[in-house]
């Protein structure tokens, strides 16, 4: 599930719902452009372990989403297609990242800070 502020750009609103779905809506009509499944649970995890998502974040015309279990998913803002899925090795990400220029700074549950470019 997601629990962050939606991103609004142009006529689109991007938001992650409680079921781990990234949704693109029309800002004026609330019509749904597309829905992309990010994953409510991590593979192999019990249903009690929700895969919480940080995001969405619009960076360089791409939508970035980071899971509690250290998975990064980059999504096309136009089609909702998942362009990249990658393990970033950060478990316990619960605090929104800091985004500066071309870098993303993320901390884990042990207060370690990581930089991604």
Predicted regions and their residues:
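Histidine/lysine/aspartate-rich catalytic loop segments that bind and position anionic ligands
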Residues: 23, 27-41
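Conserved beta-propeller blade signature
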Residues: 13-15, 23, 62-65, 104-106
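Extracytoplasmic beta-rich repeat domains
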Residues: 1-9, 35-57, 85-101
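Short loop/turn segments that connect beta-strands within beta-propeller blades
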Residues: 26-30, 76-80, 117
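C-terminal hydrophobic structural anchor segments
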Residues: 52-77
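C-terminal/domain-terminus segments
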Residues: 73-91
């Amino acid at each position: 599930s997601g629990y962050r502020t939606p991103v609004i750009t142009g006529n689109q609103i991007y938001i992650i719902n409680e079921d781990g779905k990234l949704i693109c809506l029309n800002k004026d009509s609330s019509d749904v452009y597309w829905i992309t499944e990010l994953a409510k649970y991590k593979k192999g995890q019990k249903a009690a372990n929700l895969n919480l998502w940080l995001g969405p974040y619009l960076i360089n015309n791409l939508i970035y989403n980071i899971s509690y279990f250290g998975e990064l998913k980059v999504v096309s803002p136009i089609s909702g297609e998942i362009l990249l899925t990658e393990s970033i090795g950060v478990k316990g990400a619960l605090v929104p990242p800091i985004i500066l220029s071309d870098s993303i700074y993320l901390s884990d549950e042990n207060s370690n800070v990581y930089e991604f470019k």
